[in-house]
């Protein structure tokens, strides 16, 4: 495995078809699943590790984001990553950027309205990675459903020749969606309220419920009763990420809540017939240390 911090060296290390896994480090099984997914169609798997300052609204959140360099390298090598690209802020942004990628519409609700500028930072860094590394494919997890919609729209609008590989949410054995921020969770019962609410809503949809309001209410009330401070529960169109009143198209039910000092997000992805992708569960404890 080759580790480099410059675009030039990373490109020199790559050969054949390239699959990219963009990350901010502190790897977990969700990131590793993304690497496995692009490996199936790629000669070379590149994983970027870069904590992108442009997507943080709060400087203290940026400073607090967990980091684990040696552990990340060991995990990347274990799953067969060929190149780790870990640039400095100066490599990614030689000067304070005057140009940003803004994907309107799809960023207006949910996380976009709560975290102004967040998705501009995400789209900008991903566009730079695509331009600098020129991958043939890139893997993104369905756990960040709105982010996935943003990236797919950016790729379509700007004509990047990159195939986006969607990877199902990876969950701990008790259902908690994996996130690097899970290490900060102190009240696990409250945190589990998010996934349990989503699963109950998915059960209801599977039984025929199509009302967005009712599905949102099931998810939100369940999480609240568990002790989570719910920010929103919204049924959204999978492509536009706009809120919809009825489950009658590909969609996702997203929830965001605060558990203590940690803000968590989760979702389930729906087909129009009410069937749901709830993600995959680990058989045992996560490498992050959870259940």
Task: Name each region found by the language model.
Residues 2-228, 236-240, 268, 274, ...:
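Nucleotidyltransferase catalytic core that binds NTPs
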Residues 220-263:
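Acidic/histidine-rich
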Residues 254-261, 271, 282-291:
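Low-complexity, glycine/alanine/valine/leucine- and proline-rich hydrophobic stretches
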């Amino acid at each position: 495995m080759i580790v480099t911090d410059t675009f030039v060296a990373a490109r020199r290390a790559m050969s054949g078809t390239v699959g990219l896994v963009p990350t901010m480090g502190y790897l977990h099984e969700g990131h590793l699943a993304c690497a496995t997914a692009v490996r199936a169609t790629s000669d070379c798997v590149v994983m970027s590790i870069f904590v992108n300052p442009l997507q943080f609204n709060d400087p203290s959140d940026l400073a607090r984001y967990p980091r684990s360099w040696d552990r990340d390298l060991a995990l990347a090598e274990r799953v067969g990553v060929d190149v780790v690209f870990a640039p400095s802020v100066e490599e990614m942004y030689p000067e304070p950027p005057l140009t940003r990628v803004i994907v309107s519409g799809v960023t207006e609700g949910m996380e976009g309205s709560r975290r102004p500028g967040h998705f501009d930072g995400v789209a900008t860094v991903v566009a730079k990675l695509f331009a600098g590394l020129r991958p043939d494919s890139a893997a993104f997890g369905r756990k960040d459903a709105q982010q996935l919609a943003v990236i797919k729209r950016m790729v379509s609008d700007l004509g990047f020749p990159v195939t986006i590989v969607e990877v199902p949410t990876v969950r701990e054995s008790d259902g908690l969606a994996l996130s690097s921020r899970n290490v900060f969770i102190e009240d696990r019962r409250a945190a589990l309220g998010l996934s349990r609410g989503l699963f109950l809503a998915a059960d209801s949809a599977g039984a025929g419920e199509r009302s967005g309001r009712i599905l949102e209410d099931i998810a939100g009330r369940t999480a609240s009763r568990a002790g989570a401070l719910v920010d929103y529960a919204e049924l959204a169109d999978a492509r536009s990420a706009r809120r919809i009143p009825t489950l009658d198209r590909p969609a996702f039910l997203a929830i965001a809540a605060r558990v203590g000092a940690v803000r968590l997000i989760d979702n389930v992805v729906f087909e129009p017939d009410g069937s749901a992708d709830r993600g995959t569960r680990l058989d045992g404890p996560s490498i992050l240390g959870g259940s």
